[in-house]
């Protein structure tokens, strides 16, 4: 037992210059954990509620002093004296204190900050690395980095509809080698963009945001960059997409995509064409978050060939994930801690996915900080996949550097997930 001595929150800035919540939890033995809460740009309608001030006189209404007050005035008095090793009890106490079904009274950003900082403090008190404290002795799988090297959609001011174009160095022998491969392709792409007279400016997640003619143009550029860096597409490095289709859904079952009005069925046919042309192993949010029938059709058509990831569809919520599993919708869940608001509920979603035969992908948000908790969580859960942006921008690199440290600490017991994370892909 190690009791909580103090809980303190403050307002800091994220990678977009937008306020977010940082929390410090100190235990009676002096152990201190700190956590900063991320925030998304394209957010699912069913995510837990992020409490903001709505005061247009400060930070354009995006301040988080109300969430900070929730921590310092309401949560802290309830948790002082609580056993930090009882993560489940701690999280449930905050959920009960909030009293809503989406954490809208205290704010999911307030509750999550305390949840993560408490776990960090407890790990220090136990003299364990965070990944080991959270996952136990079996935690040793280093995830495949899903590197977002071209940004479109809501993450960039360009005409490209698809939000993220990712490279996955699945053929590497270790995480450190996969990171090197990804960096080499990233820099190869930068040279190629400049030689083509295209912008090499960066989007929110560190990927390039050039003005391109089409989504296929982006994919072709990436394949060329992979080859020029000395790697083989489909063998060394494969591709993944985050479509973020809810961003261009205009009505149920209807989308505005590449300048045309199309139906769910037409969009599904488009994806089938991509699968036949490119080494794609994963497609995230290919349809609107409410298009369950479309998702069922999509999963029936291509679910045996590609990972179909639900982000806005599932929002790290076990109720929505359970519906998806029972309905045969998608086959993977994107896991974002701030979508649900506590560490316990996040791990519940990962566990449910595994039991249902679904994969899980640990993910950052477009508004990030130097906090590296998700890197530890990826190893703790042995999920085998992580999305944390391009190999650029300090808040993204922080997660990659933490994974390098974890791999070094694990030594010979470390295992890189590689191809094992994508058993459905048939192009090997």
From Swiss-Prot:
InterPro entries: Enolase, Enolase-like_C_sf, Enolase-like_N, Enolase_C, Enolase_CS, Enolase_N. Mg(2+) binds at residues 242, 284, 311. GO terms for molecular function: magnesium ion binding; phosphopyruvate hydratase activity. (2R)-2-phosphoglycerate binds at residues 163, 336, 365-366, 387. Its cofactor is Mg(2+). Signal peptide: none annotated. Keywords: Cytoplasm, Glycolysis, Lyase, Magnesium, Metal-binding, Secreted. It comes from the Bacteria. The keyword Magnesium applies. Binds a second Mg(2+) ion via substrate during catalysis. The keyword Nucleotide-binding does not apply. It catalyses: (2R)-2-phosphoglycerate = phosphoenolpyruvate + H2O. Belongs to the enolase family. This is Enolase. It comes from Tropheryma whipplei (strain Twist) (Whipple's bacillus).
């Amino acid at each position: 037992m190690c009791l909580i001595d103090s809980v303190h929150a403050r307002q800091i800035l994220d990678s977009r210059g937008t306020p977010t919540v940082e929390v410090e939890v100190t235990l009676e033995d002096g152990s201190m954990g700190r956590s900063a809460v991320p925030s998304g740009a394209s957010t699912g309608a069913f995510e837990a509620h992020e409490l903001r001030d709505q005061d247009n006189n400060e930070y354009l209404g995006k301040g988080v002093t109300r969430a900070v007050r929730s921590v310092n005035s309401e949560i802290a008095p309830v948790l002082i004296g609580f056993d930090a090793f009882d993560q489940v009890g701690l999280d449930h106490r905050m959920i009960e204190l909030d009293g809503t079904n989406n954490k809208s009274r205290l704010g999911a950003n307030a509750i999550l900050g305390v949840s993560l900082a408490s776990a960090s403090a407890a790990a220090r008190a136990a003299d364990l690395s965070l990944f080991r404290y959270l996952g136990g002795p079996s935690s040793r799988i280093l995830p495949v980095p899903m590197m977002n090297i071209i940004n479109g959609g809501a993450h960039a001011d360009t005409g490209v509809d698809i939000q993220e174009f990712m490279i996955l160095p699945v053929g590497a022998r270790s995480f450190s080698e996969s990171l090197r491969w990804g960096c080499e392709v990233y820099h190869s792409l930068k040279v190629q963009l400049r030689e083509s007279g295209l912008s090499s400016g960066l989007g929110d997640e560190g990927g390039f945001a050039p003005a391109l003619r089409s989504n296929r143009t982006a994919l072709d550029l990436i394949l060329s960059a992979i080859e020029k860096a000395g790697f083989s597409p489909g063998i060394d490095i494969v591709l993944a997409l985050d479509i973020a289709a809810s961003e261009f859904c205009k009505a149920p079952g209807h989308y505005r995509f590449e300048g045309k009005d199309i139906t769910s069925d037409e969009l599904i046919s488009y994806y089938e064409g991509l699968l036949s042309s490119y080494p794609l192993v994963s497609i995230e949010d290919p349809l609107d978050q409410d298009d369950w029938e479309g998702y069922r059709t999509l999963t029936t058509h291509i679910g045996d060939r590609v990972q179909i990831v639900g982000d806005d569809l599932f929002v790290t919520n076990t109720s929505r994930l359970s519906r998806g599993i029972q309905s045969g919708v998608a086959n993977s869940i994107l896991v974002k801690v701030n979508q649900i608001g506590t560490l316990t509920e996040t791990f519940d979603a990962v566990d449910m996915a595994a039991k249902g035969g679904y994969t899980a992908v640990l993910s950052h948000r477009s508004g990030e900080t130097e906090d590296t908790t998700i890197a530890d969580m990826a190893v703790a859960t042995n999920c085998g996949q992580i999305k944390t942006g391009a190999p650029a921008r300090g808040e993204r690199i922080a997660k990659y550097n933490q994974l390098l440290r974890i791999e070094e600490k694990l030594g010979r017991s470390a295992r890189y997930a590689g191809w094992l994370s994508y058993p459905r892909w048939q192009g090997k």
